[in-house]
Design a protein with these regions (language model features):
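Hydrophobic/aromatic beta-strand patches that form the interior of the parallel beta-sheet core
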Residues: 30-32, 64, 90, 122-126
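Glycine-rich, Lys/Arg-enriched anion-binding loops that position phosphate/diphosphate groups
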Residues: 114-169
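Charged helix-capping and loop-helix junction motifs
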Residues: 104-111
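N-terminal glycine-rich phosphate/adenylate-binding segment common to multiple enzyme folds
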Residues: 73-103
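Short glycine-rich anion-binding loops that position phosphate/pyrophosphate groups of nucleotides
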Residues: 9, 37, 69-70, 94-97
Length: 169
């Protein structure tokens, strides 16, 4: 499986090494992240200015640091940086909850998945709400069960329908 990893918290997210290491075991991983934190940017993209890409490495995986928003990162990765179109986009793990309409439509984590969906690539937006001082402890103690990711991949439409039903309520 070809996987694209992005987030809205950038390269300094304490959850990034854990997420990258886990996904690397699931398949071929490409990482495309904003160079700086880009929370609350939704699916906004850079309209003016020039996007710059810097190659980086994390957990033995080639990655790209982009001076744009999460949706920019996904767009550039899908159309210019990935050697093959990914089978899945994983956005996150977001540092904070993305619950409720205002959070969902404002989340750069979710916006990155929306950008991928426009290109026909399914995405999973992951969030974890903890106190900042407990993130590093959490990454040492927890894991993301492969069965959970597999289940999300198999039942994409069901989860999307459930999320939209909640938004309409």
């Amino acid at each position: 499986m070809n996987i694209l990893l992005t987030n809205d918290d950038g390269w300094n997210s304490p959850l990034l090494p854990f997420t990258a290491d886990y996904l690397r075991e699931m398949g071929d991983l490409t990482i495309a992240l904003p160079q700086d934190e880009q929370s609350w940017t939704g699916k906004a993209m850079t309209r003016f200015g020039r996007l710059q890409v810097e190659e980086r490495e994390l957990c033995g995986v080639t990655g790209y640091s982009i001076n744009g928003r999460p949706a920019d990162c996904v767009n550039l990765a899908l159309h210019h940086l990935c050697s093959k179109l990914p089978d899945l986009i994983v956005s996150g793990i977001n540092m904070g909850a993305n619950l409720g309409v205002s959070f969902i439509v404002s989340s750069g984590t979710v916006g990155a998945c929306m950008e991928g969906n426009i290109a026909g690539v399914p995405g999973i937006a992951l969030s974890q709400c903890l106190q900042p001082e407990t993130y590093r402890e959490w990454t040492n103690e927890q894991h993301l069960p492969a069965a959970t990711v597999d289940d999300l991949c198999r039942h994409q439409r069901e989860f999307l329908d459930a999320a939209l039903a909640d938004l309409r309520a």
